[in-house]
């Protein structure tokens, strides 16, 4: 996704991708990762997701990455929190108990910036990116995450000849091809979400499959 497009969507309040409730798949499948309480959990392209508060409530330290200042500020304002704000290189970092959100270009983040994250959670990052950016996203994720880490990934798959993203379709075959060399990819859940998307129905799609994956980093 292009930077200007993402910032304009937040500026105009066009955030249909934002979920007002905690994601049910997160609540159902997160325990499959066996991540120790207190661990740092990376949430790429986090927006103002309610899911971050759920993870905080489970005892994790959330490390969010988000391009839009408006999104980050909304997250804290809606919770009545006043974060400590500091500048770290090209990033503005918003911090409060149990969370820090790095506001800036996700692809410019380094391990030195965010420290050791034991796991990641991606509900809306990979599907926000067009095909020509997705493999770059995977490689950046691998650069940020240590060996012996895990992640929960939620994607969509549909006929993109009938409907342009975002959210974009991420075929299972693509995911296996790009990630299976460094990750054990296990599908743990999923459902047809077609009838929850008026745009997809209008486009004439017959299915819009949601896939839920547990990813385990393979040690080298």
Curated annotation (Swiss-Prot):
Keywords for this protein: Cytoplasm, Methyltransferase, S-adenosyl-L-methionine, Transferase
Protein's recorded name: Thiopurine S-methyltransferase
Gene3D superfamilies: Vaccinia Virus protein VP39
Catalytically driven reaction(s): S-adenosyl-L-methionine + a thiopurine = S-adenosyl-L-homocysteine + a thiopurine S-methylether
Gene: tpm
Organism: Pseudomonas syringae pv. syringae (strain B728a)
Transmembrane parts of this sequence: none
Compartment list: Cytoplasm
SUPFAM superfamilies, per the entry: S-adenosyl-L-methionine-dependent methyltransferases (SSF53335)
Residues binding S-adenosyl-L-methionine: 10, 45, 66, 123
A single GO molecular function term of this UniProt record: thiopurine S-methyltransferase activity
CC terms in the record's Gene Ontology section: cytoplasm
Matching PANTHER family: THIOPURINE S-METHYLTRANSFERASE (PTHR10259:SF11)
Domain of life: Bacteria
EC number: 2.1.1.67
InterPro entries, alphabetized: SAM-dependent_MTases_sf, Thiopur_S-MeTfrase_Se/Te_detox, Thiopurine_S-MeTrfase, TPMT
Membership in a protein family: Belongs to the class I-like SAM-binding methyltransferase superfamily. TPMT family.
Any GO BP: response to metal ion
Transferase listed as a keyword: yes
Main location: cytoplasm
